[in-house]
A protein has these predicted regions:
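N-terminal activation segment of mature serine protease catalytic domains
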Residues: 2-48, 58, 104-107
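Serine endopeptidase catalytic core focused on the charge-relay Asp
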Residues: 26-40, 54-55, 62-126
């Protein structure tokens, strides 16, 4: 250390480390690769609560999904890194675009998840 710099130390309990590990695993589960209309990108799953309803959503860059003029009947290919496999995700026609902003390049799309992938949504609850 130069010039009397101080290092702040924080003691962490084992139970806190285990919780961090569990949170990190959940973050990894929610991340995915997206293929749609000859475009690729990344995204992650979030679960929103609006008017006491659970909404399962995919969050990605706006330019990934708008280039193909996405429609409510469309299917997006998703690759789950931890599961090492591609799955197809259907868009929810009622809630298809919940939020988007061209300036910050973000889109949140309502989707219809199969029961076997709902476990990937519990990370970013807003």
């Amino acid at each position: 250390m130069e010039g009397g710099e101080r290092i702040n130390e924080v003691k962490i309990k084992n139970s806190e480390i285990k919780q961090i590990d569990l949170n990190l695993v959940q973050v990894c589960k929610s991340i995915c690769k997206i293929k749609y209309s000859n475009r690729c990108g990344t995204g992650f799953f979030i679960k929103l609560y609006l008017d006491d309803k659970e909404l399962y959503c995919l969050m990605t860059n706006h330019h990934i999904v708008t280039g193909g003029n996405i429609e409510s009947k469309d299917i997006i290919d998703i690759y789950f890194n931890l599961e090492k496999e591609w799955k197809k995700i259907k868009l929810d026609s009622d809630k298809r675009f919940i939020i988007y902003d061209i300036d910050i390049d973000i889109t949140i799309i309502g989707i219809i998840p199969e029961d076997n992938i709902k476990k990937n949504f519990f990370c970013y609850q807003i």
